[in-house]
């Protein structure tokens, strides 16, 4: 007979998951600054994982008493390294790096503002990367809650390069 505990098999090489995530961009000072994304991830050795996904980010800039929106539509490919977990394999803390590419539009392509001012910012293709710190918590063997902090750096656009994101998500293990 064996003594001890048996744990569910989690984060095994080849396991894949589908993620839905969202949160705030540039802190929670404005609920108008947010993001939402969808991704597919797959585990490799030592609970590390690759990720491929898409994300929509909306950040508003104040001009007089109106908001001028900047929207980014990006695709992501990255790799996350697990550096901490509990013995029961319920909590995992990972750090990851991702390459990003996509399109940015300012004020949805409308160059004229309500007061006759003209925007100099242009719509553009953008590229860059992100560094992410992510906590995974297994609710069941197939449902995982996610919490993340992420810094994006995107070049090619007319506005700020860096964007900090705070978010939550859910991952469904599909095999």
Task: List where the protein language model places each region.
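Predominantly the C-terminal beta-signal and adjacent terminal strand-loop region
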Residues: 57-59, 131-175
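Residue-level detection of beta-strand scaffold positions
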Residues: 21, 33-35, 41, 49-51, ...
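A mid-sequence interfacial segment
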Residues: 10-11, 100-139
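Residues that define the transmembrane beta-barrel architecture of outer-membrane proteins
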Residues: 14-16, 30-36, 67-75, 91, ...
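Gram-negative (and chloroplast) outer-membrane scaffold detector with strong preference
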Residues: 39-114, 172-175
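Short glycine/proline- and aromatic-enriched beta-strand/turn motifs that initiate or cap beta-hairpins
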Residues: 7-59, 167, 171-175
């Amino acid at each position: 007979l064996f003594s001890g505990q048996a744990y569910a098999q989690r984060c095994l090489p080849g396991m894949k998951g589908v993620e839905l995530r969202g949160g705030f961009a540039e802190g929670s000072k404005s609920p108008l600054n947010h993001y939402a994304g969808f991704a597919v991830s797959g585990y490799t050795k030592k609970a590390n994982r690759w990720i491929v996904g898409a994300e929509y980010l909306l950040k508003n800039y104040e001009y007089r008493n109106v908001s001028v929106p900047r929207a980014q539509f990006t695709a992501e490919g990255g790799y996350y390294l697990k550096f901490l977990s509990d013995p029961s394999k319920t909590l995992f803390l990972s750090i990851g790096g991702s390459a990003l590419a996509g399109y940015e539009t300012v004020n949805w392509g409308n160059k004229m503002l309500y007061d006759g001012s003209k925007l100099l910012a242009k719509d553009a293709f953008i590229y860059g990367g992100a560094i992410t710190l992510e906590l995974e918590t297994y609710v069941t063997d197939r449902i995982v809650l996610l919490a993340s902090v992420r810094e994006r750096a995107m070049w090619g656009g007319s506005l700020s390069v860096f964007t900090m994101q705070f978010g939550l998500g859910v991952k469904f293990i599909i095999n």
